[in-house]
Amino acid sequence: MAQKLFIKTYGCQMNEYDSSRMADLLGESHSVELTDNPDEADILLLNTCSIREKAQEKVFHQLGRWKTLKEKNPNLLIGVGGCVASQEGDAIRDRAPYVDMVFGPQTLHRLPEMVNSVAHQKIPMVDVTFPEIEKFDRLPMPSSEGASAFVSIMEGCSKYCTFCVVPYTRGEEVSRPVDDVIAEIAHLAGQGVREVNLLGQNVNAYRGLTHDGDYMDLAELITYVASVDGIDRIRYTTSHPVEFSDSLIDVYASVPKLVSHLHLPVQSGSDRILNLMKRGHTVAEYTDKLRRLQEIRPDISLSSDFIVGFPGETDADFEETMNLINEIGFDHSFSFVYSARPGTPAANLEDNVSEEAKKQRLAILQQRILQFAQDISRKMVGSTQRILVTGVSKKDPGELQGRTENNRVVNFRSDSHDIIGRFVDVTITAALPNSLRGERVDSLDY
């Protein structure tokens, strides 16, 4: 009987991608089958994230639950991967000696060897090195069960913003060769994937080697991806404003398959705070790029990241952030109160903003962006949207679910499931707090 693998994932889309590749890897090497029940698993993997506060405590809390399973089944293998693993290394086993494997984002491709070593030699393994692109050289082609898929085109970040641990946990920027990226996307298209989301911690810093020895940037890569047969929708995330280039803006005019949605983290609307964060740009430079983009795509949906309560942030600084939000009209954000991450330069700054002020500012910010989101959703009522049907509605088996270009979930009634994985036109009939409702336009499907 095949061994069972359970993976619990914290964090970003890159971690979701990495977890899927772990499953592909061990499926090929050890014929394991995924399970959603940790109690029946032979291998437990925890893919961790260190971006937010108390990340380590969250990891050890989960490992404490798994310790009981290990006591019941001494042959159970427990592995910890991701950014907390990269950051903590041997310290994870010092605190949780029942953990068998510790590996970073750049060494997950070595999982088969780790599993063999632990299973046969009973020797725990810790490998949190940064072997650059070797990870992708040794991963099998991915499998996909849906019409949308993530494709990692680069790893790491070289920006070293003062608040961020990513350069220390995932390493410097390393881009995958163009041919490898296109081959993976073509493989996914052959499995029925219609939408790809190009991933990277700083994806618009992509500089991929071509087969003739030149380098290709993200704008050129998007043009190539658009030519892959079967791929009809392209997204990318996450971007940095400094490298949101003119050529990338121009590609929105030349590649219709690139969605009218952009997530461009700004973190703050105060130049003084941006300087303390070492973001490398001003608010004016950020807004200028968005204005030029809006000239090309007037209907583009814009989202961002915000940190409130960064050390030294005053009421005036926060007001400037709100002014930026009101000027741009973001319709979604990932927003958090500041918490110091160990080993980052900002951790040495005096955290002089009270928790009460942080929470109050966050509530104000999130409420304003929610208002923008609801306004945009209401304006979509009556319009016809091209929807990629992704599956059955979670709340009603008689309905199907899909996403618009601007990343809104749409539920609509359908007697047939044959259109799952296809594009259909849906007229929006209602805007709900977290989704849209619609009616399919039967004569127009793709």
From Swiss-Prot:
Q: Which UniProt keywords apply?
A: 4Fe-4S, Cytoplasm, Iron, Iron-sulfur, Metal-binding, S-adenosyl-L-methionine, Transferase, tRNA processing
Which residues belong to any copy of the TRAM domain?
Answer: 378-442
One Pfam family linked to the record: Radical_SAM
Entries under SUPFAM superfamilies matching the protein? Radical SAM enzymes (SSF102114)
Tell me, in one coarse class, where this protein mainly resides: cytoplasm
Q: What is its EC number?
A: 2.8.4.3
| Residue ranges of every copy of the MTTase N-terminal domain listed in the record | 3-120
Where found in the cell? Cytoplasm
What GO cellular component is one of the record's annotations? cytosol
- Name a GO molecular-function annotation: metal ion binding
User: InterPro entries recorded for this chain?
Assistant: Elp3/MiaA/NifB-like_rSAM (IPR006638), Methylthiotransferase (IPR005839), Methylthiotransferase_CS (IPR020612), Methylthiotransferase_N (IPR013848), Methylthiotransferase_N_sf (IPR038135), MiaB_methiolase (IPR006463), rSAM (IPR007197), rSAM_horseshoe (IPR023404)
Question: What does this protein's UniProt record list under function?
Answer: Catalyzes the methylthiolation of N6-(dimethylallyl)adenosine (i(6)A), leading to the formation of 2-methylthio-N6-(dimethylallyl)adenosine (ms(2)i(6)A) at position 37 in tRNAs that read codons beginning with uridine.
- Which HAMAP family does this chain map to? tRNA_metthiotr_MiaB (MF_01864)
Q: How does it assemble?
A: Monomer.
- Tell me the protein's name: tRNA-2-methylthio-N(6)-dimethylallyladenosine synthase
Q: Give the organism, scientific name.
A: Hahella chejuensis (strain KCTC 2396)
What does the organism's lineage look like at the top?
Answer: Bacteria, Pseudomonadati, Pseudomonadota, Gammaproteobacteria, Oceanospirillales
Task: Give the gene name.
Answer: miaB
